[in-house]
């Protein structure tokens, strides 16, 4: 049995994190062989059944990669007698040979969120998302199996096209984020006081602007007691807009933009937060929300799906489009220690439902089950 991974598009953290965890739990099947096309930055396990294959083409270029997937990969699949081609990036640009089944995955929600797409200025990025919408729909409608990572995302796609065979397998939470009940060293760059934490890249649909506006409406007493810490790259246009708002509202010293923090350094920030906040309105599986819950600290969160699907009763919810609503929920949370204790306990219980080992085993089960189906046309 041979499964080929086309993971050449997995160049950023989220896509690589998924694959690293998946390969950590490779099944014990002796007849299983796994071939992986992936960037050299993706560290693969030293496993006898996992083999990295380097394309002869310079596939770092997305156009060259698309041509390689269309013209070269089919012949490789045929020569290797592959049973399954898995494209976790969500785009299938390869016509698999007879007998080789195709699996894709839906992770990128932006091409299917019209509000977000309209917020992107006219140009290549806007065109790219328009094209991705159509290419991904085609990929999912033609695949032998589509893996969804939230029921909400599945409902969106199934309202737009017929999916032959689908399964929902949410992402897990890395053990490094499960700091509740333990202790972590408090980073020196954190304020000595309690703080409210929001970790996310700066973009319009992350609603930092509305969050800062809401924070500015809190009482001076609450603002002095609980500074707002924003973690994310600050060299983006939306970050500049937020910086300008902080200055206009006179919140310097109370709203702190720490910039980008390495992924592995985030757990102590969640762990030491008095309150975690997540205000995104466009997600597929909100990893930041899950990782924050795993710290056992209380959470207030966007009420836009799929956030309630993952947060359940472990968060207080607000409309990310309404700074007054955000402010009211923020004030309620910061003024109610008993409520926060309940949310903290609920966060621990909810986060325990999401585990990378469970995610990986379910995924391998589906891949192997598909591979074992009788081949058609041979």
Provide a role label for each language-model segment.
Residues 74-75, 125-146:
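Membrane-proximal helix-turn-helix segments that form the acceptor-binding/catalytic region
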Residues 281:
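Aromatic "clamp/platform" in nucleotide-sugar-dependent glycosyltransferases that forms part
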Residues 294, 298-301:
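Short hydrophobic beta-strand element within catalytic cores of glycosyltransferases
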Residues 316-324, 332-337:
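Conserved acidic donor-binding segment of nucleotide-sugar-dependent glycosyltransferases
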């Amino acid at each position: 049995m041979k499964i080929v991974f086309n993971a050449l598009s997995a160049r950023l953290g989220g896509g690589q994190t998924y694959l690293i965890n998946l390969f950590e739990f490779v099944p014990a099947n002796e007849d299983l062989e796994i071939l992986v096309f992936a960037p050299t930055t993706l560290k693969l396990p030293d496993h006898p059944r996992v083999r990295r294959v380097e394309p002869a083409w310079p596939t770092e270029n997305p156009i060259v990669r698309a041509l390689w997937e269309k013209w070269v990969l089919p012949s490789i699949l045929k020569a290797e007698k592959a049973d399954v081609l898995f494209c976790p990036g969500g785009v299938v640009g390869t016509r698999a040979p007879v007998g080789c089944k195709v699996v894709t995955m839906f992770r990128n929600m932006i091409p299917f969120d019209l509000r977000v797409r309209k917020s992107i200025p006219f140009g290549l990025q806007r065109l790219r998302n328009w094209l991705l919408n159509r290419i991904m729909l085609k990929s999912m409608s033609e695949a032998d199996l589509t893996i969804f990572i939230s029921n909400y995302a599945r409902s969106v796609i199934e309202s737009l096209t017929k999916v032959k065979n689908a399964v929902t397998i949410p992402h897990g939470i890395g053990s490094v984020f499960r700091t509740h009940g333990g202790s972590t060293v408090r980073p020196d760059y954190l304020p000595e006081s309690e703080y409210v934490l929001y970790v996310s890249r700066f973009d319009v649909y992350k609603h930092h602007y509305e969050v800062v506006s809401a924070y500015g409406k809190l009482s001076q007493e609450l603002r002095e007691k609980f500074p707002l810490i924003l973690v994310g790259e600050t060299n983006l246009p939306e970050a500049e807009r937020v910086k300008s708002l902080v200055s206009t509202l006179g919140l310097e010293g109370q709203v702190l933009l720490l910039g980008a923090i390495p992924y592995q350094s985030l757990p102590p920030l969640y762990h030491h937060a008095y309150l975690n906040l997540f205000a995104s309105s466009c997600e597929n599986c909100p990893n930041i929300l899950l990782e924050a819950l795993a710290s056992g600290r209380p959470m207030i969160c966007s009420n836009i799906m799929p956030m309630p699907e993952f947060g359940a009763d472990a968060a207080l919810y607000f409309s990310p489009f309404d700074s007054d609503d955000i402010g009211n929920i923020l004030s309620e949370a910061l003024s109610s220690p008993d409520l926060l204790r309940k949310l903290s306990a609920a966060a621990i219980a909810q986060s325990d439902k999401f585990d990378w080992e469970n995610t990986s085993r379910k995924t391998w089960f589906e891949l192997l089950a598909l591979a074992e189906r009788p081949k058609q046309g041979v």
